[in-house]
Design a protein with these regions (language model features):
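Short hydrophobic beta-strand that contains or immediately precedes a catalytic carboxylate
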Residues: 39-41, 235-237, 320-321
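Conserved "right-hand" nucleotidyltransferase catalytic core of DNA-directed polymerases
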Residues: 197-269, 337-342, 354-358, 368-566
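Nucleic-acid-processing active sites and adjacent nucleic-acid-binding tracks
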Residues: 260-294
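Acidic beta-strand-to-loop metal/phosphate-binding motif
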Residues: 122-128, 236, 292-299
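Alpha-helix capping/helix-boundary segments
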Residues: 130-132, 301, 475
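A polyanion-binding, active-site-adjacent surface
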Residues: 2-197
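A short acidic-Thr-Gly-centered motif at the start of a beta-strand
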Residues: 28-33, 153-154, 217-233, 283-288
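Metal-dependent phosphoesterase core characteristic of DEDDh/y 3'-5' exonuclease domains
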Residues: 136-146, 160, 164-170, 258-260, ...
Length: 566
């Protein structure tokens, strides 16, 4: 596959599989203006486009044009917009359209890039995941819809703006149509507002990523650098650690501090003489309490390590900032849980969104096993993290209006409080835990005996040659449907026999003891497995240290989660 991709990049149309596919208008050329403000980029021509030799003429194209014409007159559209597809021949299987392959995309996209460079639009508006993947090399469309990404085609810098493909809206059917329709129109409005009211030149940092990063290996250099930062109004900092949390032997490997124009990175763990390390710690402590503001990306993570290294005073008296909190507030999506899961608020993605490069691609280290990397590589990566955290803070801070800054300050205070709560932990009465484990274990054994003494369960085991599992929906369905011959009361979304708690409750009302016992077994097992079984393992020396989350909860309320290092 890799060799085929290289051939496709080099020879283009000459080696494209679509050359062998019969089409009425192969190699369809762009239409619209030669001096576009907007460059509309689709996936590939469909049946109607191939027939009429013009982009966006099928059902999806008509849908797009209908919404588009609420913002611009039909006669004016081609004066400001250029229309093209990332693949210029219709991909199909002889009957229906299909998604173009990666080889077909590689064969065609350079000619599209050349056209964008030549016509110099302000914004390339991409519809669907295919053009997005081609231009950004694999980013998921779900997190990039309604996002402006700074990109470069040859020597031309512009923005890439991602929209859902109109055919996606058509496929959703009635259940989603209203919401997706609304959002699609919002996206189109946003791109028109951007070019007519709010346009700014794309900022792409192409080189110099490691400029002004000083790697410090001597005691005198570290002390001098720390002293020089005391007068700074703002300093970004970043820690590289060997684990997620500072418990059970976790270590800070390196630290970096940056004002963007100068960045210092130096080792922490297992490098200095004891007396020198104590002096470095004292200088760091003085610096963090010197009166300036200190910026982190994911402040709660960094503060938990600093609390472990220093004390509570540092948390409570330091002046802290968080670029992740900024990004969270700037992001207008209501479902931010999904955005976090997709990595939308990671520094690597935010540098791409704001500065046009992916930070991880500049590093030689293995993030998942950082201790396997050379210390020099870790320090350089650490320095870049701090450097671009500083720059990101400056840029995002301009986007926080007065009301968002109030929210921001409140979230910073909450972050400090949650860090304190996490670090101090919750004292657990382990003797009490043991008593409850013993109690629920006995209850489960009693219920299990009652269940396995039922005639229908014995018949199940005779028929299937399996031991009945009261937590298995498959086993429960078999007993009700094939042993007891009871029709379903409720079907699941997939039209299967439901055995949820409501259904079992109804069966229990009908006098079926198996339903009553299984319901009780489920409840008791959940109490034991969820709240007791892992407590002794997680409660180090009788203290449980949960992870508290505030930014990315579904309901907006505080949630918590366990951590393998807790």
């Amino acid at each position: 596959m890799a060799d085929n991709i290289l051939l496709a990049k080099r020879f283009g149309c000459a080696v494209c599989p679509l050359k062998q596919v019969k089409n009425e208008h192969p190699n369809m050329q762009p239409t619209g203006t030669d001096t576009p403000v907007l460059y509309f980029l689709g996936e590939a021509p469909g049946l109607d486009e191939d027939k009429y030799n013009k982009q966006f003429r099928g059902q999806a194209g008509q849908r797009l044009r209908a919404d588009l014409y609420t913002f611009i007159q039909p006669d004016d559209a081609d004066k400001y917009i250029r229309w093209n597809n990332i693949v210029r021949c219709r991909p199909h299987d002889g009957k229906a359209n299909r998604t173009p392959t990666s080889i077909e995309i590689e064969c065609c996209k350079q000619s599209v890039y050349n056209d964008i460079e030549k016509t110099k639009p302000l914004v390339v508006v991409g519809f669907g995941g295919v053009p997005l993947k081609a231009i950004t090399e694999g980013i998921n469309i779900g997190i990039w819809v309604n996002r402006f990404i700074p990109v470069k085609f040859g020597e031309h810098k512009c923005w890439y703006y991602s929209c859902y493909h109109p055919s996606f809206l058509i496929r959703q059917g009635n259940s989603y149509t209203t919401e997706y329709d609304r959002y699609f129109k919002i996206c189109l409005k946003n791109v028109f507002d951007f070019v007519t009211k709010n346009y700014e030149e794309p900022a792409i940092i192409e080189d110099g990523h490691t400029d002004n990063i000083s790697i410090l290996y001597t005691f005198d250099d570290v002390i001098k650098a720390l002293d020089s930062l005391k007068s700074e109004e703002l300093v970004a900092f970043d820690l590289e650690t060997d684990s997620l949390r500072p418990f059970e032997g976790g270590k800070i490997l390196t630290i970096a501090l940056s004002t963007y124009d100068r960045t210092y990175a130096f080792p922490i763990y297992n490098y200095w003489k004891d007396e020198d390390f104590k002096k470095i710690k004292d200088k760091l402590y003085e610096l963090f309490l010197s009166g300036g503001g200190f910026i982190a990306h994911n402040l709660k993570f960094e503060l938990e390590w600093l609390y472990d290294m220093f004390d509570l005073r540092l948390l409570m008296e330091g002046k802290w900032h968080d670029t992740m909190v900024q990004a969270y507030l700037i992001d207008e999506r209501t479902t931010k849980v999904k955005a976090k899961a997709d990595g939308m608020f990671k520094l690597n993605i935010l540098t791409y969104l704001n500065f046009g490069f992916k930070l991880k691609e500049l590093s030689n280290i293995n993030i998942k096993n950082i201790t396997s990397s050379r210390i020099a590589d870790i320090l350089l990566y650490n320095g870049m993290d701090a450097k671009y955290t500083y720059l990101l803070f400056k840029k995002q801070n301009k986007r926080l209006d007065k009301s968002l800054k109030i929210c921001y300050n409140n979230l910073i205070e909450t972050t400090i409080t949650l860090t304190k709560a996490q670090s101090k932990g919750i004292i657990i009465d382990l003797d009490c835990v043991d008593k409850y484990i013993e109690k629920y274990t006995a209850e489960l054994q009693d219920l299990s005996e009652k269940i396995h003494n039922l005639d229908e369960v014995k018949k199940f085991e005779d028929m299937t040659k399996k031991v009945f599992n009261p937590l298995s929906p498959e086993h429960i369905v078999y007993v009700f449907e094939k042993v007891l011959n009871i029709p379903p009361k409720v079907l699941t979304k997939k039209k299967n026999y439901s055995t949820n708690d409501f259904v079992l409750g109804e069966f229990a009302k009908d006098g079926y003891k198996i339903a009553e016992y299984i319901t009780a077994y489920r409840k008791t097992n959940k109490l034991k497995s969820t709240y007791l079984d892992n407590v002794k393992e997680l409660a180090n020396n009788g203290v449980l240290k949960p992870v508290y989350n505030l930014l990315y909860t579904q309901t907006g309320r505080l949630s918590s989660g366990k951590d393998s290092n807790a």
